Design a protein with these regions (language model features):
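Acidic, serine/threonine- and glycine-rich low-complexity intrinsically disordered segments
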Residues: 120-242
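C-terminal interaction module
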Residues: 1-141, 219, 223-307
Length: 307
C-alpha cells in the first residue's frame, strides 16, 4: 500500500523480510525519476536484505517501523509523531533508547570493495563476488537484477549481460549459501569500475582477509576496500533494533608507507605494485582505531541510515 506526499511516497508493508524485489525497485526508480523518495514502513519485527538496504540507501529512502510506542526510524530510538516527518531531521526530544535486535547470535563478515578493470576482450566481471567468499568456503550460486537472484552463477554470462548494458550503470544482486551481495558496474575513464558489498556468515581474521584481497589484486586493481566483522541475524538481514558497530579487520586505501606507522593495534604494508600509492592496513586488535581509514575510503557502516 502506498501513500503520496508532496515530495515523497510512503510504502507500507507487512512483509517479514523486505527484499529488493522488482516491484520495490521499480517503485524507487519511478519515484526517484519524479524527484521524490520512498519511506518504507513495516512492523518492527521486519528486516531488510543487504540488497534492499543498499537500494534504499542509494535512492535516499528511509525505513520506519511501527511498534507498541508508535513510529520510529529503524536502527535508532528516534520517534516520529507522524509519517509527515519521514524526511525531517531528528529532534532530540523525540529520541528514546533504541530497542535491541533479538537475533544477534552469529558473526558475519562484510567485504566492501571497489576494483578497476581494463576493458579487454577477455575480461570477466564478478571477480570480487567469486574470489572473496572463498576465504570462508562460500560460493555464489545466483545473480539477477532483483531479488531473489535466480540466474545460475556464471561469470561469462554475467559479463555478457553487463557489457550489453554499458554505458549505463548496472546494479546486480547475488545470492549463495549464507552469502548475500550487491554488485554495481559502471564505465570509468578508460576502465570498467566494479563496486561490491558482500556479506558472509562467519568470522575472517586480518591475515585471511589480507590474503583474499591480494589474490583479488592479481585479477583486477583493488582501488579501495574495507573488511569488517559484526554480529547479526542468521539470515544475513538487518533488523530494526539497535545496530551493532562493525569491527574493522582490513582496509586498502591510497597512501604511502612513509606516511604510515605500525603500532600495537595496526600493521601497514604496501599494496599492489611498487609506486601504486596504495597501502593495506591490518587492524590486529578489536580496539584499533579505524576512523582515519574509513574516512579516507568514504565508507560508512553498511547498516547506517544514509550514505
Amino acid at each position: 500500500m502506498t501513500h503520496s506526499r508532496d515530495d515523497f511516497v510512503v510504502a507500507e508493508t507487512d512483509a517479514r523480510v523486505l527484499h529488493a524485489s522488482s516491484m520495490r525497485l521499480g517503485l524507487m526508480r519511478a519515484v526517484g525519476e519524479a524527484g521524490g523518495r520512498v519511506a518504507w514502513v513495516s512492523p518492527a519485527e521486519s528486516s531488510l536484505t543487504l540488497g534492499m538496504l543498499r537500494a534504499m540507501r542509494g535512492t535516499g529512502g528511509r525505513w520506519i517501523v511501527r511498534d507498541a510506542a508508535g513510529l520510529r526510524f529503524a536502527g535508532t530510538g528516534v520517534r516520529l509523531d507522524s509519517l509527515d516527518e519521514a524526511f525531517a531531521g531528528p529532534r532530540s526530544a523525540t529520541a528514546t533508547a533504541p530497542t535491541s535486535d533479538t537475533d544477534l547470535g552469529i558473526v558475519r563478515t562484510l567485504f566492501s570493495v571497489r576494483i578497476r578493470h581494463e576493458p579487454t576482450a577477455s575480461l570477466l566481471l564478478g571477480a570480487s563476488v567469486e574470489l572473496l567468499p572463498g576465504v570462508l568456503g562460500r560460493v555464489p550460486t545466483g545473480w539477477g537484477t532483483s531479488e531473489p537472484a535466480q540466474v545460475d552463477w556464471n561469470r561469462r554470462k554475467l559479463t555478457e549481460f553487463l557489457r550489453s548494458r554499458v554505458p549505463a550503470p548496472t546494479q546486480l544482486y547475488v545470492a549463495g549459501e549464507v552469502l548475500s551481495a550487491t554488485m554495481n558496474v559502471r564505465r570509468g575513464n578508460g576502465a570498467l569500475l566494479e563496486e561490491t558489498h558482500l556479506l558472509l556468515q562467519g568470522d575472517v581474521s586480518p591475515r585471511e582477509a589480507e590474503l583474499a584481497l591480494r589474490k583479488l589484486e592479481r585479477e583486477a586493481t583493488v582501488t579501495s576496500a574495507l573488511v569488517s566483522v559484526d554480529r547479526g541475524r542468521r539470515d544475513l538481514t538487518v533488523g530494526s533494533g539497535s545496530l551493532v558497530v562493525p569491527r574493522p579487520v582490513v582496509s586498502v586505501s591510497t597512501g604511502e608507507l612513509a606516511e604510515q606507522a605500525d603500532n600495537g593495534s595496526t600493521r601497514v604494508s604496501r599494496f599492489g605494485a611498487s609506486g601504486s600509492g596504495r597501502v593495506l592496513t591490518r587492524f590486529e586488535r578489536a580496539d584499533a582505531d579505524s576512523g582515519p581509514a574509513a574516512a579516507r575510503l568514504g565508507w560508512q557502516s553498511w547498516s547506517e541510515d544514509a550514505e
